[in-house]
Amino acid sequence: MGATGFVASVMTAPFESMLHAASEIVEAAHDLEEDGPRGARCLGVHFEGPFLNNKFRRVHRNEWIIPASAARAKEMIDACKGGCLMVTMAPEVDGAADAMRVFLEHGVVCSAGHTSARYREGMLAIGLGFRSLTHAFNGMPPLDHRDPSILAAFIQDRRTMVQLISDGYHVSPVMVDILYRTLGDRIVLATDNMPAADPGYHIEGGVMRSADGTIAGSALRIDQAVRNYMSYAEISFAQAIVGATHAPARLIGADSEMGRIAPGTRADLSFWDEDYRIMGTMVAGTIVHGFHARTTTLAS
């Protein structure tokens, strides 16, 4: 609740199914855009997989994880018809460097995730062009003080941004606080939501779990993520909201047109009350949620 735009994630599946899903998402987003604002806009596609490390695949099925290649990267880009914004992959897997070059040539953000990489491999990945880390602490080795993981590399290099699931389950509130004190506005709040009716998954203890009890994603809304962030890191609303607005816009290279209130930017706004609850949302100057939705439009 409160979102005016989102990036749709395509999870690891048979490769052709992933391409088809991405194509369908982009086409649906285009059709909705032509009809005028009716809700949050789909900004593009994020592929989470299939170029992942089996050791840290979590709920991504082993048989669908495949080697990376330049050719496969190009197929993913082509399927999105210009709408591929980001891909999460393990930088250490075979073919990752070749795939990454293709993604970067087409302006796709490369995010490291579901990876076994340690600090040195992480620094090499950043040197090659990785600029984001998918869900800090999850799907990667722990942040060991003697043998630091890839997370240490992304914390240290100020060119990067780190995605965080602030639901209190994926990452301890204490670690959320520590990460904020270290990274500040380089944190991007991510919901990591799973489809509510996806077969084989259920909500238990506030998170989405697979049949064997493995955490498979969150049941988190972005407004709750902001409230949690404020509480865990003991920060103001003005500080916390950056993680859900300007930081993600900056990550996908769209901060000149969204993610902040300024002349020339899109009138995509969410309205919050004094208890930090969502009262309504506006997309492209039109109220689409709350306040008698679709009855009010800003004058041009």
Question: What kind of feature is each model-predicted range?
Answer:
Residues L19-E34, M100-V109, I241-R250, A254:
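Short, electropositive alpha-helical surface patch
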Residues T12, L19, I66-A70, A90-V93, ...:
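Electropositive phosphate-/nucleotide-binding environments in soluble metabolic enzymes
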Residues K74, D78-A197:
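Active-site core of metal-dependent hydrolases
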Residues A152-M161, Y180-T265, L269-F271:
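His/Asp/Glu-enriched, well-ordered alpha-helical/loop segment
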Residues R250, R260-S300:
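C-terminal cap of metal-dependent C-N hydrolases
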Residues M1-E24, G39-N53, C80-E92, V108-S111, ...:
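Divalent metal-dependent hydrolysis catalytic cores, especially in the metallo-beta-lactamase
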Residues M1-G5, N53-K81, L124-A136, M140, ...:
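Active-site gating loops and adjacent loop-to-helix segments of metal-dependent hydrolytic enzymes
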